[in-house]
């Protein structure tokens, strides 16, 4: 395998919490063209039994990405995240994400396999609220293929927020 570190079975706890913002939910709903009133209006959300506006289902990707980035910043797996592709993601919700929620996360590395020269990593992300109640479980499959060819010489420049050539 190309992975430098044996991450199978590893549990990564995100070191901070994530507070879900009301305007953040509205902006996200607009960006994904989800016009459901419960994403914009407390009254519409209350009609559905919620005490705050609710997040579009795909909003969870915002927090999931933060957890993954934190993991890759701290665990040297021996390759750039630029060669990692997310090939599958599935969310299992226990309760809706709402404005004002304080969320906590942990990522479990469920499996690491090599198939046809590619490393395939499956993670299970567990998201809980501040009361410790399960909000959602997310299952993500990541794939990387690294054959030693670094001819493109690319890297992520965090200052510019872009992929740049190094040579």
Curated annotation (Swiss-Prot):
Residues 21-124 form the MaoC-like domain. CDD domains: R_hydratase_like (cd03441). InterPro entries: FAS1-like_DH_region, HadA-like, HotDog_dom_sf. Belongs to the UPF0336 family. This is UPF0336 protein MAP_4109. It comes from Mycolicibacterium paratuberculosis (strain ATCC BAA-968 / K-10) (Mycobacterium paratuberculosis).
């Amino acid at each position: 395998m190309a992975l430098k570190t044996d991450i199978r079975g590893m549990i990564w706890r995100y070191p901070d919490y994530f507070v879900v913002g009301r305007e953040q939910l509205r902006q996200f709903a607009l960006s994904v063209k989800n016009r459901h009133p419960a994403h914009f209006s407390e009254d519409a959300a209350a009609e559905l039994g919620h005490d705050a506006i609710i997040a579009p289902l795909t909003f969870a990707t915002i927090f999931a990405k933060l957890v993954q980035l934190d993991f890759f910043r701290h665990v040297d797996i021996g390759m750039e995240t630029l060669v990692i592709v997310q090939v599958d993601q599935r969310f299992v919700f226990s309760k809706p994400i709402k404005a004002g929620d304080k969320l906590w996360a942990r990522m479990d590395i469920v499996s690491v396999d090599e198939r046809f020269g590619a490393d395939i990593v499956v993670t299970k992300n567990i998201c809980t609220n501040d009361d410790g109640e399960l909000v959602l479980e997310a299952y993500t499959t990541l794939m990387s293929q690294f054959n030693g060819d670094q001819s493109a010489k690319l890297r992520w420049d965090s200052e510019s927020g872009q992929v740049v050539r190094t040579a």
